[in-house]
Amino acid sequence: MGQKVHPNGIRLGIVKEHTSVWYADRKNYADYLFADLKVREYLQDKLKSASVSRIDIHRPAQTARITIHTARPGIVIGKKGEDVEKLRQDLTKQMGVPVHINIEEIRKPELDAMLVAQSVAQQLERRVMFRRAMKRAVQNAMRIGAKGIKIQVSGRLGGAEIARTEWYREGRVPLHTLRADIDYATYEAHTTYGVIGVKVWIFKGEVIGGRQEELKPVAPAPRKKAAR
C-alpha cells in the first residue's frame, strides 16, 4: 500500500500538515479551491528563479495569509521590499480580500524534495548525464544528514528511442511507516527529446511523540594513506 499511495497525502494529520487551511460551506468550497490553485500557479510562474518549495494558504476571517517557503528569500522580497509589496497587491486584487505574505527561508535546500527535483530537472535540461545528476543530489542529501533518499527519472533518457525508468537510492526510505517523515515531490524537465519526469523521496527520520529525530551531518570518511 505504501508503494502505491501518495507519500504526503497518507501522512496528513500524522506527520504532515495541509498546505491550504480554511473552512467553506458547500456553495463556496469550489471557488476557494480554484482560487488556491490559481494563486499557486501565479506564484510558481512569477517566482521561477526563487527556488520556491511550498506555498501555504490560510484564510482567517475575510483575509488571506500566504507563506512562501523558499531557499532564496532575497529574490522574493526584492530591493527594499518592492517585489513582495507588488506581489501582495496583485494577490489582493486576485483573491478579493486583504493578503499578508510571509517568507520562510529553507536553510537546507539539499533536504527539500521539491528543490532537489527542480535541481535535477534543470541539470537534465542542460544536458547533464542523468546518472551524474542523480548521484550528485543523493550524495549532497546524505552528507547534510538525510536518513535516506531515492530519486527516479522517467522518459527518453539520453535521447534514447524508447522511454525507460531509472532510479538511484541510498539509505532507508520506509514508505509503509506512517510516522516516518518522508518528503516527496515531482517535477518535469523539458528537454529537446521530450518531457522527463523526476520524482524524489527524502527520509528525514521518524516523528515519535510529536518530536522528530535530529538530523546530524555525516562526517566525511578519513582518507586511507596509499601504501608505498
Curated annotation (Swiss-Prot):
GO biological process: translation
PROSITE patterns cross-referenced by the UniProt entry: KH_TYPE_2, RIBOSOMAL_S3
Gene3D superfamilies, alphabetized: 3.30.300.20, Ribosomal protein S3, C-terminal domain
UniProt GO molecular function: mRNA binding; rRNA binding; structural constituent of ribosome
InterPro entries the UniProt entry points to: KH_dom (IPR004087), KH_dom-like_a/b (IPR015946), KH_dom_type_2 (IPR004044), KH_sf_prok-type (IPR009019), Ribosomal_S3_C_sf (IPR036419), Ribosomal_uS3_bac-typ (IPR005704), Ribosomal_uS3_C (IPR001351), Ribosomal_uS3_CS (IPR018280)
GO cellular component: cytosolic small ribosomal subunit
Keyword S-adenosyl-L-methionine: no
One Pfam assignment: Ribosomal_S3_C
The entry's keywords: Ribonucleoprotein, Ribosomal protein, RNA-binding, rRNA-binding
UniProt domain KH type-2: residue ranges: 39-107
Family according to the record: Belongs to the universal ribosomal protein uS3 family.
Subunit structure: Part of the 30S ribosomal subunit. Forms a tight complex with proteins S10 and S14.
Function: Binds the lower part of the 30S subunit head. Binds mRNA in the 70S ribosome, positioning it for translation.
Annotated protein name in UniProt: Small ribosomal subunit protein uS3
Organism whose genome encodes this protein: Pseudomonas aeruginosa (strain ATCC 15692 / DSM 22644 / CIP 104116 / JCM 14847 / LMG 12228 / 1C / PRS 101 / PAO1)
